[in-house]
Amino acid sequence: MKQLFLIIGAPGSGKTTDAELIAKNNSETIAHFSTGDLLRAESAKKTERGLLIEKFTSQGELVPLEIVVETILSAIKSSSKGIILIDGYPRSVEQMQALDKELNAQNEVVLKSVIEVKVSENTAKERVLGRSRGADDNERVFHNRMRVFLDPLAEIQNFYKNKNVYKAINGERSIEEIVNEMQKYILSFAN
């Protein structure tokens, strides 16, 4: 059975980089998928679905639920690795509920933990506006992305706390410290 770890955090929290490094350090057993990367890859294909994704992401809005869930489940099931890290998901209560429903309806994948990389809004803003990855990284869109992240956060945290799978990690430290803590935590489930 595949072990799933969801890594959430504000834009600029470092969740994608953390997950990439952990997967690289454990490439035999761990696969990493960034929801953002999966959606950007689809968008770049300029397919009908890709253009729809681009319409939402260029405004800092959430991509429709069914597109996101399809993309994620397809990535998990096609992976040859036993431990799957997905960052940037869930970003809404609806995404959380849809994934929970899908996970409960099958026995190939088990959710082991939801890890939140916690940073202040100031840290997130400095990182995102200093990074300028694309057209969506300007101040107006940053604030929209923060609102989209923060609005459902308490409900998402409580849902996973009630399932005893929520873990918070301080994202205000060096990348080495964050990655070491997260990696040790993830690997503790493999034993």
UniProtKB/Swiss-Prot annotation:
Organism from which the protein derives: Helicobacter pylori (strain G27)
Function noted in UniProt: Catalyzes the reversible transfer of the terminal phosphate group between ATP and AMP. Plays an important role in cellular energy homeostasis and in adenine nucleotide metabolism.
Assembly with partners or alone: Monomer.
Subcellular location: Cytoplasm
Name used for this protein in its record: Adenylate kinase
Domain of life: Bacteria
Top-rank EC class of the record's enzyme: transferase
Similarity comment: Belongs to the adenylate kinase family.
Ranges where the record places region LID: 130-136
Domain notes: Consists of three domains, a large central CORE domain and two small peripheral domains, NMPbind and LID, which undergo movements during catalysis. The LID domain closes over the site of phosphoryl transfer upon ATP binding. Assembling and dissambling the active center during each catalytic cycle provides an effective means to prevent ATP hydrolysis.
Positions annotated to bind ATP: 12-17, 131, 173
